């Protein structure tokens, strides 16, 4: 981006890379309640404010930057978007981010998924109550487990079997 806080906070900026079948974050965001609320209330978002604290400077809708980078009443602003992500869903079998960070030799390997999740929950609870947020994460983890059991593990087993079959 061109070092404009307004541009950096705009979901369209993130969506230039985070799009398509292999990582469709912008498509998911645009169709979500958060994305719809952002488009509806964009003029109330104070996107060019020097500080941008959820619940203080705006409360209409989160953007990618809100959840993954913005300051909260208890967390400083961060440029490390991985500090609030508790799953890495890029591999066939999703892993906790400290596992994938360790394989790549990244400093994030020192930060466990529970800390990252608590960082994100801190963001969420500026707009949602704690029960709602905890319920979301229960469903999210269950969905990861369901995907692994129903698709990823059987798919990997078939792939392994096909490699062993010489015909």
Where are the predicted features?
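Primarily the internal scaffold of c-type cytochrome electron-transfer domains
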Residues: 2-167
